[in-house]
UniProtKB/Swiss-Prot annotation:
Part of the phosphoribosylformylglycinamidine synthase complex involved in the purines biosynthetic pathway. Catalyzes the ATP-dependent conversion of formylglycinamide ribonucleotide (FGAR) and glutamine to yield formylglycinamidine ribonucleotide (FGAM) and glutamate. The FGAM synthase complex is composed of three subunits. PurQ produces an ammonia molecule by converting glutamine to glutamate. PurL transfers the ammonia molecule to FGAR to form FGAM in an ATP-dependent manner. Pfam families: GATase_5. One of its GO terms (cellular component) is cytoplasm. This is Phosphoribosylformylglycinamidine synthase subunit PurQ. The keyword Metal-binding does not apply. It comes from the Bacteria. Its main location: cytoplasm. Keywords: ATP-binding, Cytoplasm, Glutamine amidotransferase, Hydrolase, Ligase, Nucleotide-binding, Purine biosynthesis.
Length: 223
């Protein structure tokens, strides 16, 4: 299995993400934002502040040449994971539905956050029980997810909401912390699984999440 991690100017979580996957024995490649072609089974858009989040979060990143490769990967049915700023990029580019607003307190929030697993009928959260409570770090200023009523109904009816905040830290509608697309191949979440990979630092629930992609691709590895 190959994981391509896209690096934009301002990305700051690419090395944490690399560490997490390499800890699982997976080959990774950091792809510069100007590269249009890359070979991967899973594409990850990591956290950070792409292009300084000027205009608004992810507004410029969605136009980067590397996004052409991301779109091509999506058309082939490949897996895509967007973490924090990566989730914002998926929303801005239309690969996932909805939008992000500033946190309702207009402040940057950085803390460990309780989350509820809403759906485990997907590769990403298949290793968790439905309604299981987990903890992951969050660090964002624009994590207030928003969608219109029609989109929210679709997300609910099609089981596309994967994670909810417990309790809500930022005003996100329906407490949404993460969603996926209809094919359950494209995932976006604001919390950072790559920052929860060592028990000595708090927990390693992030590894359990990422491991789902490996099992989906029938990878054999040792822990």
């Amino acid at each position: 299995m190959k994981v391509a991690i896209i690096r934009f100017p301002g990305t700051n979580c690419e090395f944490d993400t690399t560490y997490a996957f390499e800890k699982l024995g997976v080959k990774t490649q950091i792809v510069w934002h100007e590269e249009k072609e890359f070979d991967a089974d899973l594409v990850v858009l990591p956290g950070g502040f792409s292009y300084g989040d000027y205009l608004r979060c992810a507004a410029i990143a969605k136009l980067a040449p590397a996004m052409q490769g991301v779109f091509n990967h999506a058309k082939k049915g490949g897996y895509i994971l967007g973490i924090c700023n990566g989730f914002q990029i998926l929303l801005e580019s239309g690969l996932l539905k909805g939008a992000m607003k500033h946190n309702n307190n207009l402040s940057f929030i950085s803390k460990n956050q309780s989350l509820r697993v809403v759906s485990n009928d997907n590769a990403f959260l298949k290793n968790f029980k439905k309604d299981e409570i987990i903890n992951l770090p969050i660090a964002h200023g624009e994590g207030n997810y928003y969608a219109d009523e029609t989109t929210l109904k679709e997300l609910q009816d099609k089981d596309l909401i994967i994670l909810k905040y417990e309790p809500n830290p930022n005003g996100s509608v329906f407490d949404i912390a993460g969603i996926c697309d209809e094919n359950k191949k494209i995932f976006g979440l604001m919390p950072h699984p790559e920052r929860a990979c060592e028990k000595v630092l708090g927990n390693d629930v992030g590894l359990k999440m990422l491991k789902g992609f490996l099992l989906e691709n029938f990878i054999n590895f040792n822990f």
